[in-house]
Amino acid sequence: MKASELHQKDQAALNKELSDLLKAQFGLRMQLATQQLTNTSQLKKVRRDIARVRTVLTEKANQK
């Protein structure tokens, strides 16, 4: 997800997106631990998406 798309969302939508990404990250970590994950680059993508969402949330909080 691009940062420009995240800037257009409100804080509630960003929190939901963050929650979904954290659940996805947990699932991927479990798959990695049980050696079921074949595409390990998904972990990196999800981790970076989480960082993007948290950055936008912080920016919105500091604007107020």
UniProtKB/Swiss-Prot annotation:
GO biological process terms, semicolon-separated: translation
UniProtKB keywords: Ribonucleoprotein, Ribosomal protein
GO MF annotations, alphabetized: structural constituent of ribosome
A GO term from the CC aspect: cytosolic large ribosomal subunit
Transmembrane is among the record's keywords: no
InterPro entries: Ribosomal_protein_uL29 (IPR050063), Ribosomal_uL29 (IPR001854), Ribosomal_uL29_CS (IPR018254), Ribosomal_uL29_sf (IPR036049)
Protein name: Large ribosomal subunit protein uL29
Organism of provenance: Paraburkholderia xenovorans (strain LB400)
Source organism phylogeny: Bacteria, Pseudomonadati, Pseudomonadota, Betaproteobacteria, Burkholderiales
Originating gene: rpmC
